[in-house]
Each structure stands twice: as C-alpha cells, then as structure tokens.
C-alpha cells in the first residue's frame, strides 16, 4: 500500500518504512506528525477531493539537517560586475511509520538493532 501526501505545499509518494526528506518542519527529533492524504493506492485506489476521508499517514521526525550548498553566480561581462551568493535549505528527514485507510492499516516494522560485529577469536 502506498499514499500520496502533502507536506509544506509539495506532494510525496510514500510507503510504510520510507524515509523522505522534506522542507523544514518545526519539530523536534522523535516527534510524530500526521500528514493529509491526497491518494491511497494498493489493491484498491482512492483519490481524494481534496483529501481522502478517514485516511492518515503518520511519520516520525528522524533528523533536522541542511541541504547541499547551491551557488547563485551572476556576471555582467566586460563590466567587472559579478555577484556570488550561496544558499543551503533547512530540511527534515521523516520516517513513515503507519499508513491507514480503506479499512486496512500498514505499519512499518521497527528498525532492528544492528547485530554486534563478530569479535576476533580470543584464542588466536
């Protein structure tokens, strides 16, 4: 099952356990958000007008970060005129934990802890 959600004026196609990078949300790491659902897909499809009634997508904020630097450079030739400006967008990484609607619910499996690294043989 997948869903199309709206976050900060943009649309994202998500499934359970996906991690998406969206524009900055004012939220602390670990907080939970519910996003409006524009469309649900799977065995049956539901398209909202504008939202699908009773459908929810829940996500947990994983990280607050910044994007790559974008350089804006303007030059007017033969005028000795140039301008250089950099920009880095504030971004939020969100992990989709649950999609529910159309009578079914899909939950993301909790991230399993990484198995400990095999230790070197102590007898060697």
Curated annotation (Swiss-Prot):
Matching entries from InterPro entries are given as: bL21-like, bL21-like_sf, Ribosomal_bL21
State the Gene Ontology terms under molecular function.
Answer: rRNA binding; structural constituent of ribosome
**What's the name of the protein?**
Large ribosomal subunit protein bL21
Which biological process annotations from GO are given for this protein? translation
**Compositionally biased, Low complexity: which spans?**
115-124
Q: Which organism is it from?
A: Xanthobacter autotrophicus (strain ATCC BAA-1158 / Py2)
* Biological role stated in the UniProt entry: This protein binds to 23S rRNA in the presence of protein L20.
Quaternary structure per UniProt?
A: Part of the 50S ribosomal subunit. Contacts protein L20.
Q: Mind telling me which GO cellular component terms the entry cites?
A: cytoplasm; ribonucleoprotein complex; ribosome
- Judging by the UniProt lineage, the source's domain of life is Bacteria
- Give the family from UniProt: Belongs to the bacterial ribosomal protein bL21 family.
Q: What's in the keyword line of the UniProt record?
A: Ribonucleoprotein, Ribosomal protein, RNA-binding, rRNA-binding
Span list, region Disordered: 105-124
NCBIfam families for this protein: L21
């Amino acid at each position: 099952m997948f869903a199309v959600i709206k976050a900060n004026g943009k649309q994202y196609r998500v499934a359970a356990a996906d991690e998406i990078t969206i524009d900055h949300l004012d939220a602390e790491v670990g907080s939970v958000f519910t996003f409006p659902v524009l469309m649900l897909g799977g065995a049956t499809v539901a398209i909202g007008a504008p939202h699908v009634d009773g459908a929810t997508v829940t996500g947990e904020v994983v990280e607050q970060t910044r994007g790559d630097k974008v350089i804006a450079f303007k030059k007017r030739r033969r005028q000795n005129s140039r301008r250089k400006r950099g920009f880095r967008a504030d971004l939020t990484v969100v992990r989709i934990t649950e999609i529910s609607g159309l009578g079914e619910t899909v939950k993301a499996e909790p991230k399993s802890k990484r198995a400990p690294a095999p230790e070197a043989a102590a007898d060697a």
